[in-house]
Regions:
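Conserved ABC ATPase "signature" region
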Residues: 125-143
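Q-loop/switch helix immediately C-terminal to the Walker
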Residues: 99, 106-118
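Helix-to-loop junction immediately C-terminal to a conserved catalytic motif
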Residues: 62
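Conserved beta-strand-loop-alpha-helix hinge in the C-terminal portion
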Residues: 234-257
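ABC ATPase NBD coupling module
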Residues: 79-94, 244-247
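Conserved catalytic motifs of ABC-family nucleotide-binding domains
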Residues: 168
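Conserved ABC ATPase signature
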Residues: 147-151
């Protein structure tokens, strides 16, 4: 039993002294000396203003590029995983790009099926029953045979989410999910991420560990359980929302609308 308990408490992500470079400009550093641990079942929001390197941080966390310095482990395996032999570990993590980043020459159905076709070598007919439940759950069914260019940004983001979920990841990284969304779609995302965190039916009720980036903390106050900030090339772990609100500071004013910041000040 002790051995099983140790496995359950092993971090899913761990960084020591990590420096992150820019994906588009490798010579530029966006964050330095990151020390961070993510446990199974965590729900993190990493906040920062536009241009602070949130997307680069998430791309590095998702093993799409190596850290400039430092060490990083995913499920105990050193990152990044570029070799084919350790790809299985990498596929336990899903990544949702800002905007969805679908292929416009493929239909929505074909975009979502890509991980199954490529990583599991499934044929079109074999993949279909595995993607249809996600089309339904994400309300994409009416546009399944359309191309991404035929639908709005609100829906394109969901295509990227469905594509990341078809392989049933244990960890999901989501870049700026609420950016550019109207209130209805933003509310849907918040509720759906809550369902993933609790354990979605399509994932056999297994909770997913979440790391989300955001430029506005307000929508996440009652949702996420852990918060961190990227500011001036520094990654700072803030803790729970109660700890964030108690700390206050200039950075909080930057990442909250004025009325939300006033409302969430701790009572003195």
């Amino acid at each position: 039993m002790a051995e099983g308990t140790a496995e359950l408490t092993e971090p899913v992500l761990r960084m020591e002294g990590v420096t992150v470079g820019s994906l588009h400009d490798p010579g530029m550093v966006v964050a330095e000396d990151i020390n961070w641990t993510v446990q199974p079942g965590d729900y993190w929001v990493v906040a920062g203003l536009q241009g602070t390197g949130k997307s680069d941080f998430l791309m590095m966390t998702g093993s799409l590029m190596a850290p400039v310095r430092g060490r990083y482990w995913l499920f105990g395996e050193p990152m990044p995983i570029f070799d084919e032999g350790r790809l299985k570990t990498r596929l336990r993590l899903g990544l949702v790009f800002d905007g969805g980043q679908s292929f416009n020459h493929l239909t929505i159905r074909e975009n979502i099926a890509l991980p199954l076709r490529y990583h599991r070598n499934l044929g079109k007919a074999e993949a279909e029953p595995l993607i249809q439940p996600w089309l339904d759950a994400l309300e994409l069914g009416p546009w399944a045979d359309s191309t991404p260019g035929a639908i709005g940004r609100n829906w394109q983001k969901r295509v990227g989410l469905a594509r990341a979920l078809v392989l049933h990841p244990e960890v999901l990284l989501v870049d700026n999910p609420l950016g550019g969304l109207d209130l209805r779609h933003a509310s849907w995302w918040l509720d759906f991420l809550d369902a993933l965190s609790r354990g979605h039916t399509l994932l056999d009720h297994r909770p997913v560990t979440l790391v989300v980036t955001a430029a506005n903390l307000q929508p996440w106050i009652a949702r996420a359980r852990q918060f961190a900030i990227l500011r001036e090339r520094r990654f700072s772990v803030l803790g729970t929302w109660a700890q964030v609100a108690a700390a206050g500071g200039e950075w909080l004013q930057e990442l909250l609308p004025a009325e939300a910041a006033d409302h969430n000040k701790p009572n003195r």
